């Protein structure tokens, strides 16, 4: 992962240094190939190399009068981890956000090298390139600092771009705009369709070109879950987002969260108490979906059975217990930091 003391790592360039020769080898073989590249930027720790470090920041990250990072340093479960890659004496949260932006710009430049190589090798027209991510990120949002373990849209919504050339020209739709939802489960059936590969496998996802052409139903509502740093599930519609905690989380969030995504797209105002009838309606849709999937698969939903997700052996009984137990970073340092906080 890297740390500030180890220096800024050119992670994307390191991967490209392996990927480019592999592309050359595969192109020379002149056979069908699949190449998976897992660029880690802009995953934390955000340590983009120069000049990307200051591309989006012109302030003083060590300003002693700036206290925007105080609540970040005060969050015990992640404090040890943050201190490992934040610059020493850094006080400005905007500087850390700028490192994330710089990491994105650095990755964009590195992906450009891959795309240019496909053109240079003369295989761009016969190559499908899929660009996506496994999660988004919260920066200074929802008091979930520089993390991605939640069910807010910051984390749920990810990019999906599919680039293809003349070899797949029948899939070109011009400048067509369709306002609908795509899911990562749709990627495999879409790619198989583009390659003309038929299979008897019944996918949960859809061919997105069928979605664009109106041949399959839209899926405007979806079931959402989180079971890494918290155990929650919920239901999302174009208008509403419901989140239900199955046990207390270490962010001290309420058990029920409801957001109006039309009026409050950044999900800053929990209106669960104001609209209890909406909570019950969405909860019923969610539980009906879970019951349907349990019947289809013959399995109990893992969100109910994975009770040792936290490594603690049982569900947490309070947010305070979760806060005092969970941590990322060096275990001994985390324990020491928590003991100091207890003494305070």
Where are these regions (language model features)?
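Catalytic domains that recognize anionic headgroups
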Residues: 1-344
């Amino acid at each position: 992962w890297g740390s500030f003391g180890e220096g800024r790592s050119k992670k994307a360039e390191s991967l490209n240094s392996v990927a480019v020769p592999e592309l050359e080898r595969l192109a020379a073989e002149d056979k069908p190939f699949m190449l998976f590249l897992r660029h880690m930027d802009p995953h934390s720790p955000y340590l983009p190399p120069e000049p990307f470090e200051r591309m989006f920041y012109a302030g003083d990250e060590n300003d002693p009068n700036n206290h925007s990072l105080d609540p970040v340093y005060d969050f015990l479960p992640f404090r040890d981890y943050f201190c490992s890659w934040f610059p020493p004496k850094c006080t400005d949260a905007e500087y850390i956000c700028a490192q994330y932006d710089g990491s994105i710009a650095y990755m964009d430049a590195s992906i450009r090298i891959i795309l240019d190589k496909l053109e240079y090798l003369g295989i761009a027209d016969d190559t499908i390139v899929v660009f996506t991510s496994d999660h988004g990120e919260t920066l200074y949002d929802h008091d979930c600092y520089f993390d991605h373990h939640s069910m807010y849209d910051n984390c749920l919504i990810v990019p999906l771009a599919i680039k293809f050339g003349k070899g797949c020209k029948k899939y070109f739709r011009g400048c067509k705009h369709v306002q609908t939802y795509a899911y990562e489960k749709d990627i495999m059936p879409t790619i198989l369709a583009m390659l003309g590969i038929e299979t008897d496998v019944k996918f949960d996802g859809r061919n997105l070109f069928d979605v664009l052409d109106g041949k399959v139903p839209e899926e405007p509502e979806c079931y959402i879950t989180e079971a890494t740093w918290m155990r929650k599930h919920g239901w999302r519609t174009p208008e509403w987002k419901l989140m239900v905690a199955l046990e207390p989380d270490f962010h001290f969030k309420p058990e029920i969260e409801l957001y109006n995504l039309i009026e409050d797209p950044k999900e800053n105002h929990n209106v669960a108490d104001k609209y209890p009838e909406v909570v019950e309606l969405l909860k019923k849709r969610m539980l009906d979906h879970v019951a349907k999937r349990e019947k289809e698969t013959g399995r109990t939903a893992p969100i109910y059975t994975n009770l040792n997700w936290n490594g603690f052996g049982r569900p947490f009984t309070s947010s305070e217990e979760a806060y005092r137990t969970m941590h990322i970073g060096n275990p001994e340092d985390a324990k020491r930091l928590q003991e100091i906080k207890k003494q305070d």
